[in-house]
Design a protein with these regions (language model features):
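Helix-loop junctions and hydrophobic alpha-helical segments within the transmembrane domains
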Residues: 310-337
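Hydrophobic transmembrane alpha-helices
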Residues: 243-247, 264, 280-301, 344, ...
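Juxtamembrane segments of multi-pass membrane proteins
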Residues: 408-410, 414-534
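Transmembrane alpha-helices and their membrane-interface boundaries in multi-pass membrane transporters
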Residues: 276, 293-305, 329-348, 353-395
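Alpha-helical transmembrane helix bundles of large polytopic membrane transport and channel proteins
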Residues: 92, 96-172, 177, 189-193, ...
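Signature of alpha-helical transmembrane segments and their immediate interfacial
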Residues: 2-42, 378, 392-443, 457-460
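Extracytoplasmic
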Residues: 61, 92, 140-253, 491, ...
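Interfacial segments of transmembrane alpha-helices in multi-pass membrane proteins
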Residues: 226-281, 348-352
Length: 602
């Protein structure tokens, strides 16, 4: 007798000699894990979605604080459906929505931008010099005079296409998010954040005149988690379909329920184990329970089929269960361990959510070994297979179904030859076209959601009505301390900016050079001849004395170049990356490096 057979017989004797004790222990264990499984919560993290060891992400994380307004942000659009934004009722709603968003936990309140926040300002050159202020005038009372002032201030602020739509029918509240909830110190709960936006903003302020649109990573995740309830309904439907198919196949109700219950217990035990390990269910791993259930049913059906086969030969229910265990245990555990190892290889992908998916799948497969290869044979050794099912199997043993006859023809010439030829052709075609496989998103908006989902419709509205799109790609121009405003560095930034503006897929590009040019323009009586960079260091410093936050860091060692894209498709991103890379190679310069990449598209 081989070593493997001795091992199987050892486990068979161990399990079936102590089947009451083992089954009781497994029931108690599954009860504990099932309770833990009911406590598992949906979770998502912005950083877990990123390959944190990738060069681009390392560059972003090194300047994460300085670029907080350009990474994980939410845009809330307040649209006037029956007019424009220069309306007293609209401005009242915009003010209230701004306040609502401001007080939602997780919003970085220092970086919040709206027409009603003091960090959004206008500036003008007059005979007396520079004047400026907030968009909303002091003492605002909703009068036509005040609304005219707001219109004038918006036109002077440069926010048209950015915070204000090109048709003046809507405006944006830009809310950068924190990684943690400041009230609890825990990672930001995107589901609760998304729910707060829906309850406190969209549901509260949407009316016959006002439409609220919301986009951003947090909203995508929130919508995906909301969809988890639909996933539960689909799971219940899958269970029902499997019940019907198993009964139709075996004609044994008790074994059908045994297989399905063991597979469901595997799912709950998996969720419970993940909860004990400190993991939750993220939008990418919420479909793993389907996988665990499917694998469990697959192995369960094989066990039931084997028990029926042995019962046909006259074996009693205990002996039939033992023989089925003996014939399938080694093959089953080998297959499941292979599955677990296969899922574990996903750990090499350096993205948190993918690694958690690998852990979830591997844990689920490991638990199937207990619930379906150990517990199920024990259960069937007690309840057995119904005589009706055994008789049904015996009658159909020699009956060949139409489907079997159809596929059997493929083992004979000429269909066998045709099958091989077609297979080789499909393989060759697949091999050829695989070289054109795109990495990344192929459609605009959030590919995780349907094209006609509310989120993607909201995103399409912003792309259509705003110059500054929701897809932002940021290049970090890194210099020495106090060197980002040096003339030579500004010239290189300006040249790269010009090339990017003339790159397919780019809507607009802004950087510190735009601020400096506008400063020169303003300091020289608004003469268009002076819209340029100045070689004099003191003049440059003067032009940047009022630089808005986010255009340089504290010690002027990094200046972001902000690129607004048409979309975040793979082709668009590759084009932008190649433009920056080629520029860096063509114009190497000591003292400045163009680092990729930040922003939600970076």
């Amino acid at each position: 007798m081989s070593h493997s057979n001795k091992l199987v017989l050892f486990f068979e004797k161990l399990i079936f000699s102590n089947r009451i004790l083992i089954l009781t222990s497994l029931i108690l264990l599954c009860a504990v894990l099932t309770f833990q499984g009911t406590q598992v919560k949906p979770e998502a993290s912005f950083l877990k979605m990123l390959p944190t060891n990738h060069e681009f992400i390392k560059n972003f994380l090194s300047y994460k604080k300085e670029l907080s307004n350009l990474g994980n942000v939410v845009r809330v659009v307040v649209e006037n459906k029956n007019g424009d934004i220069f309306d007293a009722d609209y401005q009242e709603v915009l003010k209230n929505v701004t306040d609502e968003v401001f007080f939602i936990s997780g919003v970085n309140r220092d970086g919040l931008k709206s027409l009603w926040t003091p960090n959004v300002r206008w500036q003008e050159v007059t005979e007396e010099g520079f004047i400026g202020g907030s968009i909303i005038p002091d003492g605002y009372n909703g009068s036509k005079k005040n609304l005219d002032i707001i219109k004038s201030n918006i036109l002077k602020s440069g926010q048209v296409g950015n915070l204000v739509s090109n048709d003046f029918k809507s405006s944006i509240i830009l809310a950068p998010l924190q990684d943690t909830n400041p009230e609890t110190g825990l990672p930001l709960d995107y589901h609760q954040f998304s729910k707060a936006l829906e309850d406190n903003v969209r549901a509260k302020y949407t009316s016959e005149n006002i439409n609220i649109r919301i986009v951003g990573f947090a909203k995508v995740v929130g919508d995906l988690i909301d969809g988890a309830m639909q996933v539960v309904l689909f799971f219940m439907l899958a269970v029902l379909i499997v019940l019907l198919l198993l009964w139709f196949y075996s004609r044994c109700l008790r074994s059908t329920f045994a297989v399905v219950i063991c597979s469901i217990l595997a799912v709950f035990a998996q969720l419970g184990t993940l909860n004990i390990m400190g993991y939750g269910i993220n939008p990418y791993s919420m479909l793993v329970p389907f996988l665990v259930f499917a694998i469990g049913v697959s192995h369960g059906v094989q066990i039931v089929n084997s028990i029926i086969h042995h019962a046909e030969t006259g074996a009693n229910k205990l002996d039939a269960a033992k023989l089925a265990f003996r014939s399938l245990y080694l093959a089953g555990i080998t297959a499941l361990i292979s599955d677990a190892i296969g899922f574990t290889t996903l750990m090499v992908i350096d993205i948190g959510v993918i690694q958690e998916l690998a852990i979830a799948a591997s844990v689920g497969v490991a638990i199937i070994i207990i619930t379906n290869l150990v517990a199920l044979p024990i259960i069937l050794s007690f309840i057995g297979i119904s005589p009706k099912a055994v008789e049904y199997s015996r009658k159909n043993t020699h009956n060949i179904s139409l489907v079997e006859k159809l596929f059997a023809n493929f083992t004979k010439a000429p269909l066998a030859i045709l099958t091989i030829v077609v297979s080789v052709g499909l393989f060759s075609g697949g091999l050829y076209y695989s070289q054109f496989m795109k990495i990344g998103d192929l459609d605009a908006g959030a590919p995780e959601l349907r094209p006609d989902s509310r989120y993607n419709l909201d995103n399409a509205f912003i792309v259509e009505n705003y110059t500054a799109s929701t897809d932002v790609f940021v290049i970090m121009a890194e210099t020495g301390a106090d060197q980002c405003s040096k003339y030579n560095n500004l010239v290189l930034i300006d040249q790269l900016q010009w090339q990017l503006k003339n790159t397919a897929g780019v809507q607009d590009v802004i950087s510190i050079t735009d601020i400096s040019k506008l400063g020169m323009f303003g300091m020289n009586e608004g003469s268009l001849k002076w819209v340029n960079l100045n070689r004099n260091e003191f003049v440059v410093n003067a032009t940047l004395s009022q630089v808005p936050s986010g255009f340089i860091n504290a010690d002027c060692s990094m200046a972001p170049i902000i690129v607004f894209l048409n979309d975040h498709k793979a082709d668009t991103l590759n084009t932008v990356v190649n433009t920056v890379t080629d520029f860096s190679k063509q114009y190497p310069q000591d003292g400045i490096k163009f680092l990729l990449a930040a922003g939600n598209a970076g």
